[in-house]
Amino acid sequence: MTRTIEPSFRESVDLMFNRAAALMDLPPGLEEKIRVCNATYTVRFGVRLRGQIQTFTGYRSVHSEHMEPVKGGIRFAMAVNQDEVEALAALMTYKCALVEAPFGGSKGGLCIDPNLYEEHEMEQITRRFAYELAKRDLINPSQNVPAPDMGTGEREMAWIADQYARMNTTDINSRACVTGKPLNAGGIAGRVEATGRGIQYALREFFRHPEDVAKAGLAGKLDGKRVVVQGLGNVGYHAAKFLSEEDGSRIVGIIERDGALYNTEGIDVEAVRQWIVKHGGVSGYPDATHSAEGSEVLEADCDILIPAALEGVINLSNADRIKAPLIIEAANGPVTAGADEILRKKGTVIIPDMYANAGGVTVSYFEWVKNLSHIRFGRMQRRQEEARHELIVSELERLDRYLGDAWSIRPDFKLKYLKGADELELVRSGLDDTMRIAYQSMREVWHARADVDDLRTAAYIVAIDRVSKSYRAKGL
């Protein structure tokens, strides 16, 4: 029997790109220019730790500079390699184009297991990596702007921003060199939750269109839908929390490194999160059935499957056993090209990663703009909005007194209406708007073209078209 070989992550991205590009009329040579990575840098540096020098290997890939700066996260993991960062950089290009964030695509990574080092050691390593990238202009507010990814967070972004500022003491925009920073270091409200919140907004927009929902063999709204989440990290946790608490979805399965939980009646996401923090995993959690094999829950009966961890978790070996009629890719590349083909033939609807997890880069865009403008969102207009609303409320109260029992103001109306939007509300509003418009641009292609039978191909067509127009505007 001939064994089918799974393509690499980079090859999977290229296969999906090629499928969409074949349906487009691009100028000769431009398809190749868009597809290939412009450059990938490998840096090796030493750090003296525990009495000896340890050498680390890091990468920063720049996929496309049709718009600058380029944008993309930095991940810390032992599995980081050139193929991975190039695939992720390519996805960043298409993702930014799809949601109309004015960036090219980039990605970086460091081969390291953060669990093996103390905090002060991680700071040394991160600062040195930042130094190696910054001196090559691979960290710069106007050229290359990193963000958090797997294994990194606000802490690492604060170290990187400070290291860049130390190296560029006269750059007034130094805080804009990286996004995903803590609020007290130039960050923005809502960045930590952004990708998970984007998943929620993406699903809400999908369920606003009954004909799209019907394609997945579903009906109705998010309320009551059975959801399985693979990976309860930052993205999976926030997506599951918001869907269960705000939309009435039922989280029936949670998959983690040490196994999985399943309960058809629903799982308390917050309780599981606290259990993981305390015990290091889901094993022993009392209010759900524990399975040592996460694959059992990945393949369980549910309405919505959210792969929110690593790439390639749904592949040729398990695609035909996936029962969920709707998959939303919270992680980057969780479905391989081969698995994607199997699932499409089964009729599974996949909301693709380049759209679904774009909440992170969207709010990073807002943070970058905030850093360049040197003022938080809402500072100039919030009180003025409240004053205008006060005039309306005063007039309504006068009418209330005049009309008596014939008409009255709801008790909580004044409190809600008088409160001007703060930064978090503005960020969420901007993210919601972005996710709605991006979905509608994909949906238009999906429904208008007979040769496009899935959202991923539609998303690639929209993104490639926008990138190609940027290159042609440059005279290429």
Annotate each predicted stretch with a short phrase.
Residues 8, 12-15, 38, 80-83, ...:
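Conserved active-site and cofactor/substrate-binding residues in soluble primary-metabolism enzymes
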Residues 27-33, 100, 138-147, 171-174, ...:
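Flexible, glycine/charged-enriched surface loops at secondary-structure junctions
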Residues 87, 171-172, 253-256, 306-307, ...:
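General beta-strand structural signal in soluble alpha/beta enzymes
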Residues 3-8, 206-207, 321, 325-476:
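Adenosine-phosphate binding glycine-rich loop
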Residues 189-299:
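Glycine-rich phosphate/diphosphate-binding loop of Rossmann-like nucleotide-binding domains
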Residues 1-194, 200-202, 206-207, 356, ...:
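N-terminal ligand-binding/catalytic initiation module
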Residues 59, 109, 143-144, 175, ...:
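Structural motif
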Residues 259-350:
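Rossmann-like adenosine-cofactor binding region
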